[in-house]
């Protein structure tokens, strides 16, 4: 199992627009071979010092893929290129962690 945690930071005030595009792309991703989980998440309010907030312009993408090859095919998929082109000017930063079980 391959795990991906991607921290996405949008330009100020654009998170909802990026999430709208993300949600529109989700059905195509969920239909991909090997996709176990693919979903965005935002900060849970009221957690205090227990958490390190992503912030109002950020969200995390939580992914699970059956194999590394499935993840690589996902990254090269035409719908991902289209999503990337749609949101690229709205993003300030992205950090992607690709992990394996320990």
Protein language model annotation of sequence segments:
Residues 1-2, 102:
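Absolute protein N-terminus
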Residues 2-9, 39-75:
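Short, well-ordered beta-strand segments in beta-rich or mixed alpha/beta enzyme
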Residues 11-13, 101:
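Generic structural motif
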Residues 14-40, 79-83, 87:
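Short amphipathic alpha-helical segments
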Residues 27, 34, 70, 92-96:
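Generic structural signal for secondary-structure transition and capping sites
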Residues 39-57, 82-102:
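Glycine-rich beta-strand-turn "strand-cap" elements at beta-sheet edges
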